[in-house]
């Protein structure tokens, strides 16, 4: 691949759109690009041939749905800074119902963790998991289950932004926001625009694609969020020789405790935000993560668990990378990685 040197200003894409005043200095890259990885070929047969008009006023086209299809590949975009300081690539994996946009920008137009970690000198690989975004999804002939869609109220009430059930309102003035919450509520409507359907039966395909990415890019550092906790720990257990560190940001799912010993040589940081005791589900989900961390320690692993309020970082929702203090949390993660000898 031909390498080239250039500087770009990564401007935000959320409303308020194209707001360079909220962005940082131009980012100097030695390269950037994208690719797809993983996937499989399936065959569909026995379906009727249809004639469709594919565009208004167009000429009808005969569409035969029978044949071979490429499915379950994953889209990955990478950014390689000119002044590299991270000793290994940093892979960012998003949570459920979301895409790699999670890390690209914030709902109110500030830098996301993608930009922040590039500026800190990390080669960053940001992906859309199988079934999401530019990775696409398979037809109902391949995936038999139905996708799940989120209402606008659901993340507000479930991601510890609002005060729980009934706290969202179509009138922003009537929203019941948790006191001191750092999520940019003024941009909540923009946040809901990035939500995509999710399936509950595609875990094997997602894990297969993430494993293919690790095989292609690593050794590396894994940074994953929420639903990707289960994927990240599972892939690390399968490829422990390729993972140099794990950063688990509010993992909603943990790994297999019986396999925790496989991560013995991988330094791991687990980060939790605020308001967890006030939520109906998160105390249990955090306990699952803590139990897995204990299993890792029992097996000889090194795990640091940070509850942000306990270190003076308060007000974080489940979407820490979007909160108004996202830079402070990014600094904490980067310092931890640097202290582990993984960045200069």
Which residues does each predicted region cover?
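N-terminal cap/lid segment of alpha/beta-hydrolase-fold proteins
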Residues: 22-85
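Short beta-strand element of the alpha/beta-hydrolase
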Residues: 86-96
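Active-site glycine-rich loops that stabilize anionic/oxyanionic intermediates
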Residues: 94-106
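Conserved alpha/beta-hydrolase
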Residues: 110-136
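Conserved acidic catalytic loop of the alpha/beta-hydrolase fold
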Residues: 200-221
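Gly/Ala-rich beta-loop-alpha elbow adjacent to hydrolase catalytic centers
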Residues: 223-232, 236
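The feature captures the conserved acid-bearing segment of alpha/beta-hydrolase catalytic domains
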Residues: 248-308
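Catalytic active-site module of serine/aspartate enzymes centered on a nucleophile-bearing elbow/loop
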Residues: 313-315, 319-344
């Amino acid at each position: 691949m031909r390498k080239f040197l250039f500087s770009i200003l990564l401007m935000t894409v959320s409303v308020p759109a194209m707001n360079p005043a909220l962005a940082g200095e131009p980012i100097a890259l030695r390269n950037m690009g994208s690719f797809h990885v993983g996937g499989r070929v399936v065959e569909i047969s026995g379906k009727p041939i249809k004639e469709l008009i594919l565009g208004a006023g167009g000429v009808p086209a005969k569409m035969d749905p029978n044949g071979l299809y490429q499915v379950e590949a994953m889209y990955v975009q990478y950014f390689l800074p000119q002044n590299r300081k991270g000793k290994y690539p940093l892979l960012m994996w998003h949570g459920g119902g979301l895409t790699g946009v999670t890390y690209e920008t914030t709902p109110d137009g500030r830098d996301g963790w993608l930009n922040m970690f590039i500026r800190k000198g990390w080669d960053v690989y940001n992906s859309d998991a199988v079934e999401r975004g530019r990775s696409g999804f398979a037809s109902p002939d391949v995936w038999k289950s139905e996708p799940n869609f989120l209402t606008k109220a659901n993340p507000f009430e479930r991601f510890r932004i609002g005060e729980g059930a009934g706290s969202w309102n179509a009138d922003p003035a009537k929203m019941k926001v948790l006191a001191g919450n750092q999520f940019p509520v003024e941009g909540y409507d923009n946040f809901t625009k990035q939500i995509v359907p999710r399936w509950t039966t595609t875990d094997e395909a997602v894990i297969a694609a993430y494993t293919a990415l690790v095989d292609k890019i690593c050794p590396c550092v894994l940074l994953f969020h929420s639903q990707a906790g289960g994927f990240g720990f599972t892939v690390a257990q399968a490829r422990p020789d390729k993972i140099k560190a794990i950063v688990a940001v509010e993992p909603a799912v943990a790994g297999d405790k019986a396999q925790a010993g496989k991560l013995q040589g991988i330094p791991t940081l687990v980060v939790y935000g605020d308001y967890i005791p006030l939520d109906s589900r998160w105390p249990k989900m955090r306990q699952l993560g803590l139990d897995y961390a204990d299993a890792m320690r029992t097996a000889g692993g090194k795990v640091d668990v940070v509850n942000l309020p306990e270190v003076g970082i308060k007000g974080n929702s489940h979407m820490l990378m979007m909160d108004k203090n996202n830079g402070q949390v990014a600094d904490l993660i980067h310092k931890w990685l640097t202290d582990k000898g993984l960045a200069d």
